[in-house]
From Swiss-Prot:
Organism per entry: Arabidopsis thaliana
Gene Ontology cellular component list: membrane
InterPro entries: Cation/H_exchanger_TM (IPR006153), CPA2_transporter (IPR050794), Na+/solute_symporter_sf (IPR038770)
Lineage of producing organism: Eukaryota, Viridiplantae, Streptophyta, Embryophyta, Tracheophyta
Protein name: Cation/H(+) antiporter 8
Swiss-Prot/TrEMBL GO biological process terms: potassium ion transport; proton transmembrane transport
Function: May operate as a cation/H(+) antiporter.
Length: 816
């Protein structure tokens, strides 16, 4: 064949040669033929060297092309995402993906049809592999949307959320149809089908889109976020019902419409009456806590594909099949969470951006010029842009008015309305489906895409401008131990992550309880990571009997343990148990909200490290718990304590032993808070308190500043007793002073007394900028414990004594 020269070949031979070489070609009669299975990869540089002009470049083969598109899209959308973060803009990830696809569209337009970039991105007369993969990713996105959605929350939603959700959908639709009917048929630039599609899609609020927006903005655990999620859930369900109802109305005949509705009903019956019970049987057979096998995951994915095929045969929106199947899958562990964990990260980061790129590449950007200058443009573009703007304003208005009538602050009502007016990938996909059915024209589709891109960029920026997360937990009162009356009620919030935290928290509560004259109220919060769901949940077990409700299956051990403690140990302590099912990165919001709502004085958190039973080795080190503790310290509306539990005597179980407590006091508000807590413990019969004050060697003890004066006031009683040579038997309190040269002296002193106590209580900032920590502050591993607290909790400390690190309430807002 002359070294690859095929110019002399007849069309028939040339076609056979090309087909044999790279698997697809245009046949001599003009038909496009492919060899199955097709040749996916290039043979490299040899292809061009052997057959020269007949050979393909490596990017023209399907697998290399797919790899190039995936990498190109991934780096572009990640680049936009990083850029927005650097600029401090609150732009969701889906918006970055849209911009990546839009940029590629512009590059293809500018480079021309024959450029390399167009050859890679634009598929002519061949299967669009990247687009097909993106479409599959979009089906998975819809399926996971259904899995994450908890429809039962509609019945638990506040009236404010329910009314807002319904009004946000129905009001724009009603007004839109009234305006459409007021115009004569001759003066309507849009067809009824176009108007119908736009009116419905612009009025609906997508739950998954709002959940993703709030997650990206870090608002899904805020009070506004919770109302928005409930409202969006109601709105989404109402919108889906309207879509299904629209099927019969848009059918050619009433019989056709009823037939389609019957087939949809059959699908729903199979999903909820057959598939869902099977899933529950699988869960029951596998047992709680055991992982789901891969074969079940694969089986569910097959059902997703079959569901979409069924809905496509009905000429309906195929992803709805995946969505309703997802609703039938039990959310949360083990199946729902396993599906989300296995599929979501890869699908959202890699595959779904391909779908958005494919949508953007189908957009005609030249149509935007007429839309942006629609006052002087044609009537149709003016009508499309006007309708989008009108529905947006109607939706925004009603979403502000309804919550405001329910006594929500105006600023919060505006933020909620902006959230409810957000548009994204769901609306984009419906418009693409409408374009494929020729319900809308290419120009109309392009203008609608532009409106969604602008909406997805501007709405989050407006929300970020109005929403100030630092004001979420503003407290207008002092909520700390130092400002409490001696016999005042102590309200604590105890946080539990795992069963091994229960006993240590109970022992500490028992030690800090004085008497019925000085009441103790304890709120117990069991923290459970949100898996396989979108909506965080806070369950109060005071209003929910054991065995009823989803929260009890997670918290049964916690509830029973504290009920036993309440009945058999301290019946006069008031205990209220909660379960918080939330995203690990935002649990601090739920802790602080509960502390603020219940007027808590002290939050007690477990340390992120857990020791073995003999207290000699570390068995777990969970960074997520440490991250949570650090964030609670930053934004708590009250004082916070971190308990490093290694050995804490239970006085009821060991009545012959006393609990020996030592406070390391250097000075400052955190040390005063630690002393106030320890003084409360010292009023117990079996508690012995030692207060060790560390003084800088050679410096005067006289108060020279406000902090020092406050320290002196707190220690006055103890100093007086010590100077008189007394130890008060009724309080069993000892006061000691020790002069320290530097951190080495402090280290030696603490090591010498390591085995004398059961519990050390220190302030978080104990010894900060003081001679007591000079030389050892650089060795601090955990900043949340402070220098002294970190030293006492370190594995190098000789004894395995428990440590409580206390931070006083940081800020109290001015009433003005």
């Amino acid at each position: 064949m002359g070294g690859g020269d095929i110019s002399h070949m007849s069309p028939e031979v040339k076609w056979i040669f090309e087909m044999a070489w790279y698997g697809e070609t245009v046949r001599y009669d003009g038909l496009i033929c492919e060899e199955h299975p097709p040749k996916l990869s290039s043979d490299g540089i040899w292809e061009k060297l052997i057959i020269k002009s007949a050979g393909l470049y490596f990017w023209q083969y399907r697998l290399p092309k797919l790899e190039i598109v995936i990498l190109l899209v991934f780096f572009l959308w990640q680049g936009f995402n990083i850029l927005f973060k650097k600029l401090g803009l609150s732009i969701p990830k889906l918006s970055s993906m849209m911009l990546a696809g839009l940029l590629l569209n512009v590059l293809v337009t500018l480079s021309g049809e024959n450029s390399i970039i167009a050859d890679i991105l634009v598929t002519k007369n061949r299967i669009d592999v990247a687009g097909c993969l993106g479409s599959f990713g979009f089906l998975i996105f819809w399926f996971l949307k259904g899995v994450r959605m908890d429809v039962k929350r509609i019945f638990k939603a506040e009236a404010k959320a329910r009314v807002t959700g319904v009004a946000a959908v129905t009001f724009p639709i009603v007004v839109g149809f009234l305006l459409f009917n007021l115009k004569s048929a001759k003066n309507r630039p849009l067809t009824f089908q176009e108007y119908d599609v736009m009116l419905l899609m612009e009025s609906i609020t997508s739950f998954s889109g709002i959940a993703r927006l709030l997650r990206d903005l870090g608002m899904n655990h805020s009070s506004i976020g919770r109302v928005a999620l409930s409202s969006a859930l109601v709105s989404d369900i109402v919108g889906l019902l309207l879509l299904i109802a629209n099927v019969s109305r848009s059918s050619a005949t009433l019989a056709d419409g009823l037939a389609i509705l019957t087939e949809i009903t059959l699908f729903l019956v199979i999903a909820f009456a057959v598939v869902r019970p099977i899933m529950f049987k699988i869960i029951k057979r596998k047992g709680e806590g055991r992982p789901i096998e891969d074969k079940y995951i694969h089986g569910v994915l097959v059902l997703v594909c079959l569901s979409c095929m069924y809905w496509e045969d009905l000429s309906q929106f195929p992803p709805l099949g995946a969505f309703f199947l997802g609703l039938a899958i039990p959310n949360g562990p083990p199946i729902g969470s396993a599906l989300v964990e296995r599929l979501e990260s890869f699908n959202f980061g890699i595959i779904l951006p391909l779908f958005l790129t494919a949508v953007m590449l189908r957009t005609d950007t030249t149509a935007w010029k007429g839309a942006l200058t629609f006052f002087s443009g044609d009537d149709k573009k003016f009508a499309v842009a006007s309708l989008v703007l009108l529905i947006f304003l109607l939706k925004l208005s009603v979403s502000v008015i309804v919550p405001y009538l329910y006594k929500m602050p105006l600023r919060d009502s505006i933020i909620l309305a902006l959230i409810m007016s957000h548009k994204g990938i769901i609306e984009l996909s419906f418009y693409l489906f409408s374009l494929s059915l020729k319900l809308v024209t290419k120009d109309t589709f392009s203008i609608l895409v532009l409106s969604i891109v602008l909406n997805s960029l501007l709405i989050p920026m407006a929300i970020g401008f109005l929403y100030d997360p630092s004001k979420q937990f503003i407290c207008y009162q002092k909520r700390n131990l130092a400002s409490m009356k001696n016999m005042g009620e102590l309200k604590t919030l105890v946080c539990i992550h795992r069963p091994d935290h229960i006993s240590s928290m109970i022992n500490l509560l028992e030690a800090s309880y004085q008497s019925e004259d000085s009441p103790l109220t304890c709120y117990v919060l069991h923290l459970v990571e949100l898996r396989g769901q979108d909506v965080p949940t806070l369950i109060s077990h005071k209003v929910q009997k054991l065995g009823v409700g989803a929260g009890n299956k997670y918290s049964e051990n916690v509830i029973l343990s504290f009920e036993h403690f309440h009945r058999s140990v301290c019946s006069s302590i008031s205990i209220d148990t909660f379960t918080c099912i939330a995203n690990a990165n935002h649990m601090q919001d739920d802790i602080c909200w509960l502390a603020l709502d219940k007027a808590v004085t002290l939050i007690i958190l477990p340390f992120h490290r857990t020791w073995s039973l003999d207290r000699t080795s570390i068995v777990s080190d969970v960074e997520a718990i440490r991250f949570l503790n650090v964030n609670v310290l930053k934004q708590a509306p009250c004082s916070v304590g971190i308990l490093i539990e290694r050995h804490l005597v239970n006085k009821k179980q060991e009545p012959h032993e006393s609990l020996k407590v030592c406070v390391i006091f250097v000075g400052g508000k955190d040390d005063r808070e630690a002393l106030a807590f320890a003084k409360r413990m010292a009023r117990q019969e079996n508690v012995t308190l030692t207060v060790l004050r560390l003084l800088a060697s050679g410096k005067s003890k006289d108060a020279t500043g406000w902090d020092q004066m406050l320290d002196t006031v707190e220690l006055r009683e103890l100093i007086k007793s010590n100077n008189a040579g007394m130890v008060k038997e009724e309080t069993s309190t000892i006061y000691l002073e020790q002069e320290i040269l530097d951190g080495a002296d402090t280290s030696m002193l603490l090591r010498s007394m390591a085995f004398d106590y059961d519990l050390f209580v220190v302030g978080r900032t104990c010894g900060e900028n003081h001679e007591a920590t000079k030389g050892i502050e650089n060795w601090c591993e955990f900043e949340e414990l402070g220098v002294i607290g970190d030293f006492l909790a370190s594995p190098d400390f000789p004894s395995k004594t428990s440590v409580l690190v206390v931070q006083q309430q940081r800020t109290v807002a001015n009433n003005n």
